[in-house]
Amino acid sequence: KDKFPPDSVLITYLDDQDKYVIPVIDRINSGFKLRNGTFHKGLDIHLTRTTPVKAAFNGKVRYARFNTGGYGNLVIIRHFNGLETYYAHLSRLDVKENQLVKAGKVIGLGGNTGVKWSGPHLHFEVRDHDFAFDPEKIFSIKDSVWLGDKILLKKADFHSVIAASRKYHRIKSGETLSYLAVRYNTTVSKILKINPKLNINSIIGIGMKIRVR
């Protein structure tokens, strides 16, 4: 299986049959960047709790429910151009999983579910093969325009996300792999997969550093 991301990848996200819509047009509160030691994998766009949030492209809803990992009410749409888009912190969900949607379809209303320390905003991500890249590489919210129908991304466009997405835990007394799986909303099998030196029978010692994401 080919590794992703490659050195570079050309994505054609629009063609003559595709339509597109910027999900919300307002000011950007926070961009795609390292923030407080963690990489922020999308844009935080200001809105109100009554602002309609729209699908960026035609596609199929893969996820539409409350997410306990910090996204709150989250909609994920898998698009026919190969990309996925994430719409987080919604106050209301207006679509269901496996529903086909057109670009511009209202998928929910703005909110701040999943976060306690900030006002209403849309956290918006664009991903290719589950690797996020800067949404402002394909459109400008400030100018309300798309920046073309293709984008050439290099490995560096994904690199900081890959590195910063890794999370480690140092074992304390009494902690087990099952405990880590529950705490970090994952599974034991996934933890073992990203820690090749561990197996289900490994002895977990105090002070051991284990990757959990």
Model-inferred region functions:
Residues K154-T187, I204-V212:
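Primarily a LysM-type cell-wall glycan-binding module
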Residues P6-L14, I25-A55:
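Short glycine/threonine/proline-enriched tight-turn/helix- or strand-capping micro-motif at secondary-structure
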Residues N29, H46, K60-R62, S91, ...:
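Conserved positions in beta-strands of structured domains
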Residues L192-I206:
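Short acidic, glycine/serine/threonine-rich helix-capping segments at coil-helix boundaries
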